[in-house]
Each structure stands twice: as structure tokens, then as C-alpha cells.
Curated annotation (Swiss-Prot):
Chief location category: membrane
Amino-acid positions noted as binding heme c 1 in the UniProt annotation, renumbered to this chain: 56, 59-60
Topology of this chain in the membrane: Peripheral membrane protein
Modified residues (Pyrrolidone carboxylic acid): 37
Cofactor: heme c
Field pH dependence: Optimum pH is 5 for ubiquinol oxidation activity.
Keyword Transport: yes
UniProt-recorded name of the protein: Alcohol dehydrogenase (quinone), cytochrome c subunit
Described function: Cytochrome c component of the alcohol dehydrogenase multicomponent enzyme system which is involved in the production of acetic acid and in the ethanol oxidase respiratory chain. Quinohemoprotein alcohol dehydrogenase (ADH) catalyzes the oxidation of ethanol to acetaldehyde by transferring electrons to the ubiquinone embedded in the membrane phospholipids. The electrons transfer from ethanol to membranous ubiquinone occurs from pyrroloquinoline quinone (PQQ) to one heme c in subunit I (AdhA), and finally to two heme c in subunit II (AdhB).
GO cellular component, one term: plasma membrane
Note: Inactive ADH is produced under conditions of low pH and high aeration, where the bypass oxidase activity is highly elevated. In spite of having 10 times less enzyme activity than active ADH, inactive ADH is not distinguished from active ADH with respect to their subunit compositions, molecular sizes and prosthetic groups. It seems that in inactive ADH, an improper interaction between subunit II and subunit I/III complex impairs efficient intersubunit electron transport in the ADH complex.
First and last residue of the signal peptide: 1-36
Amino acid sequence: MLNALTRDRLVSEMKQGWKLAAAIGLMAVSFGAAHAQDADEALIKRGEYVARLSDCIACHTALHGQPYAGGLEIKSPIGTIYSTNITPDPEHGIGNYTLEDFTKALRKGIRKDGATVYPAMPYPEFARLSDDDIRAMYAFFMHGVKPVALQNKAPDISWPLSMRWPLGMWRAMFVPSMTPGVDKSISDPEVARGEYLVNGPGHCGECHTPRGFGMQVKAYGTAGGNAYLAGGAPIDNWIAPSLRSNSDTGLGRWSEDDIVTFLKSGRIDHSAVFGGMADVVAYSTQHWSDDDLRATAKYLKSMPAVPEGKNLGQDDGQTTALLNKGGQGNAGAEVYLHNCAICHMNDGTGVNRMFPPLAGNPVVITDDPTSLANVVAFGGILPPTNSAPSAVAMPGFKNHLSDQEMADVVNFMRKGWGNNAPGTVSASDIQKLRTTGAPVSTAGWNVSSKGWMAYMPQPYGEDWTFSPQTHTGVDDAQ
């Protein structure tokens, strides 16, 4: 039998043991919760990066709108559509989407209600997104994005093109089956990562690959042949240039370092971003990791050249000499001297990382003159980035020069300094471009169309001396 003193001591020791066990259990629970929270935060952070890779914010944010709340006007060949609200708002956004719903929308272009989204969303490329990347992006949109109760705008498309059910047929006809994740057949892991970035989240082919009769991207990878990344159709009256290794009109004269710097800052010594690519750099690629930029560059430099005309010859100095003598009655030369030479120089070399060269520039000598004509008429903006914080604006000349004068200077630049671009731009071409938005050429579409126009926001404030650029480049920069 235990005496009272012994019994009390045992009870006291048992209580102390219970307290210690409870404390240890509480610490374990707290540690587990903290560890889970850290894991969740890491997943959200990873998802934010994947969303940057995919450039979601550029399309799903209206000019001066709230991030990811949609409302961006996109003028397609069949009518106007508006990007949707992808914040976690349960009524107007995707707050009620499960991970399965989210995955189906990204990879198949099918909404929670079963309707097919318009292929302005690059879901054929997003089908390449890995399970881990989709899971991370879902965590970001559900827990890292502020919900915005903004109702989606209805598309402005005439019947019968407004019907969505044919989009399922379009998907079946033109969207190939994709294997998610990195292509395991590529032996070099860095090149494989670059291929994944270019053809998956980066969806580069949406602009840099020509389109077919159904307005579909002609090729989603090297299996598509020479069309793949060989230069796109008119989108916002900009022609995305070839990303193949062609010396004249592609990346043949670019180094890997050039590509990395271009994607990070928007400018290198011999080129600068223009049109929609300004948005891509501002919103997406400047935020990519150095390893991902290097992988992208390495993959692009692995791409072979495709057959092309001889659009660049040897500069014999005659263009520079003509300009040094005042143009001597050459209409295009005189327009150039009075409006262009102060930045792009008489020898067409420009100023490194400020005013791109015109001599040998792929944008100038490419077969389709639409981009050059568009920047002459409407101007352009070199956006500020973290690594190159200065913005540079080129004014448009549509209110200063006649259509004939703009045509003259475009033709002059396409034939000067050894440039040997084909064709001639007329005053009528400029007039249509300026007033109706019709591209000078529609070769990339295989159809007569003004192409897509996505009025994109830019990360500029009202206090800048130029109005915020739109994806059309119609920014009226001062």
C-alpha cells in the first residue's frame, strides 16, 4: 500500500510527464504546420514564376485594370473578344475551379462549364505544361492573387461565328496531341529545358510561326518542318521575325549572349524589341531566371536555318554617300535625312542599345514590310526593364508625313546600305494601314485578313511623356 506522501509524489510526477508530452506534441504540431505553410508559400512562389513564364498577366489585365481581372480587348479576324477574369473570385473569376478544372482549361481550352475557350488563349502550347508547373500555378492563382469581382465582357462576334461548339471541331482538326513536360528525347538537359520553355509556357510559336487557312499555328515544334518559328503572320500589324538560324532574316548573326540580353533588357547593340514583343519582355522574359534565359538561347541557336531569298547584300557605301550629299533629289533619302538620320545615322547603324540599326536589320529586310511601315506610321516604344531602366520612344509620322512620303522612306530603308528587301510599298498600302489597320502583306495568314489586334497594357504611368503603349503599337509616342 502506498502512503499518502508517496501517492502524492507519483501523481505530481505523472502530471509533469503529461505536461511534457503535451508540450512536445504541441511543438510537433506547430513545426508541422509551419513546415506545411513554408511548403505552401514555396509552391505559390513557384506558381507565380510559372505564370510569369506563361505571360498570363499581359493578356488577362486590361489597360489600367487590376491584375488578372481580364477585360483586355482583342480584335480577331472574326470579331472582338475580351480576356477573362482569372482571379479567384468565385462568381466572376475562377475561384470555384478545382485543380482538375484548371488543368483542363490550360491543356484543352475547356472551361468549367464545358464550353471551349477562344484560341486567343494558347492552350495548344499550354498542353505542354508539366503537372508540377500546373499545380504550382493553381496554388498561385487560388492563394496568391487578389480576387476581383469584375464581370466578364461578352464577345462582340456576329452569328454564326459567335457559336462556341465549332471551336471543339477546330481543336480536333488543328491541335495535335501534346506530351506534357520536358521532351525526354532531347539528350542535352539545357536544350530540353529551352525547348520546353519556347514551346510550352513561352508559347513563342503563337507569334513567330505562320498560320494556316484555319488561322491555326502551322507547326508546334520541329516536327512541323520549315514553318516552325520561321516568322509569323501580321498580328497588330507587326510581323514577328524568324527565330531560325537564317543569317539575313533570323538569328544567324546572334550569339547566345545576344538572345539572353535581348530577352532580359529588350535591347542589344544591333536590335531592339518592337510591337507586341515589348510587352513580352516587360511582363515576362525580364523576370525569367538567368538559367532559363540561357536554356532558351541555347535551344533557339540549335535550330537550323530554312530556305530564304538573298535579302541582304554588301554595303557599297553609296547610301551613306547619298545622304552625306543631302539626298540629291531622292525622295526617300530626303525624308530620311529630315526625320530619321538624327537617331539612325546616315550610315544606318543607329546608336547601340537606344536606336536600332537599319542596315541589315531583319525587321527591315524581311519579305513582309508591314512592321517597318507600321513603326514609321505609328511609332514605337522601347520599354524600361530592370536591367535597362531607360525608356526610348520613337514618334509616329502619320500626322507629319504624307502617305507617299512614308512609302518613299520605307522603300528607301529596305533598299539602302546593302539591304535587298523584295517588293515596293505604295502610298495606297500606307493609307490602308493607317486608316483601316490592313497589313501591307498578308502572306503569313494564307487568308486576306487584318490579323489579330490585342490592345495590350504597358507598365508605364500617366506621368510619362508618351501615352501607354498598346499591343498595336498605335501609341502616338511624343
